[in-house]
Amino acid sequence: MTIGIIGAMDEEIALLKQQMKDMEELEVAGCYFYTGHLHDKSVVLLLSGIGKVNAAMATTILHERFSPSMIINTGSAGGFASDLQVGDVVISEEVLHHDVDATAFDYVYGQVPGMPATYKADQRLVELSSEVMKDIEINSRIGVIATGDSFMQRKDQTDIVKQRFPGMLALEMEAASIAQVCYRYNTPFVITRALSDIAGQESSVSFDQFLQTAGKNAAQLIINMVKKI
């Protein structure tokens, strides 16, 4: 069994790298793969780069090179629910693209032609994530995570996405692409995102200020999940 763990930025995987043993590094097309062990489990930690194309490419290379048994995507996101705070974690029940529009061809908004409207996370991994969050006493919610190639800093941007997807809990830039690749490879996945900012509320300042806190909480979740897998 090989567990694939994906993060977009150095800050999102730094603590995980520190915990790995027997680590080796491989660079492919600008993506960095760190193989080794975490709690005696075989893991491949992937630094994918930011955005949907980078995430999809990196996740595909991960599958072709390492054939992961499951994928856990860690990192940060912007929160939407009023009861969520910076540092809280959102666990994906399902993931979708918020910036895809093929409605002219009778697809629902957010649906890539030929693909499902949403990508459902593996229920066992979702339940494990939720269980671990209770153990380490970090607030979490299970729900919808939306992905697009924009950092949502302005209220008018976030209002549009909220209107289209009122049940969304978090917004970020890689998860749906990772989920789509996992769907094609039939690989179980879960997305876990710690909130580094509240979308639409001075996001650029808040993101920089709280990224390390979000990264720490996300890493705690992954480390404890791997221990129980």
From Swiss-Prot:
Alphabetical list of Pfam families matching this protein: PNP_UDP_1 (PF01048)
Keywords for this protein: Amino-acid biosynthesis, Hydrolase, Methionine biosynthesis
Xref: SUPFAM superfamilies: Purine and uridine phosphorylases
Hydrolase as UniProt keyword: yes
CDD domains listed in its UniProt record: MTAN (cd09008)
Active site annotation, chain numbering: 12, 197
Any one Gene Ontology cellular component term annotated for this protein: cytosol
An annotated GO BP: nucleoside catabolic process
InterPro entries reported in the protein's UniProt record: MTA_SAH_Nsdase, Nucleoside_phosphorylase_d, Nucleoside_phosphorylase_sf
Binding, substrate: 78, 152, 173-174
GO molecular function, one term: adenosylhomocysteine nucleosidase activity
Enzyme Commission numbers on file: 3.2.2.9
Domain of life: Bacteria
Catalytic activity: S-adenosyl-L-homocysteine + H2O = S-(5-deoxy-D-ribos-5-yl)-L-homocysteine + adenine; S-methyl-5'-thioadenosine + H2O = 5-(methylsulfanyl)-D-ribose + adenine; 5'-deoxyadenosine + H2O = 5-deoxy-D-ribose + adenine
Pathway it works in: Amino-acid biosynthesis; L-methionine biosynthesis via salvage pathway; S-methyl-5-thio-alpha-D-ribose 1-phosphate from S-methyl-5'-thioadenosine (hydrolase route): step 1/2
Keyword Amino-acid biosynthesis among UniProt keywords: yes
Reported function: Catalyzes the irreversible cleavage of the glycosidic bond in both 5'-methylthioadenosine (MTA) and S-adenosylhomocysteine (SAH/AdoHcy) to adenine and the corresponding thioribose, 5'-methylthioribose and S-ribosylhomocysteine, respectively. Also cleaves 5'-deoxyadenosine, a toxic by-product of radical S-adenosylmethionine (SAM) enzymes, into 5-deoxyribose and adenine.
Family (UniProt): Belongs to the PNP/UDP phosphorylase family. MtnN subfamily.
Protein's name in the database: 5'-methylthioadenosine/S-adenosylhomocysteine nucleosidase
Species for this entry: Oceanobacillus iheyensis (strain DSM 14371 / CIP 107618 / JCM 11309 / KCTC 3954 / HTE831)
Taxonomic placement: Bacteria, Bacillati, Bacillota, Bacilli, Bacillales
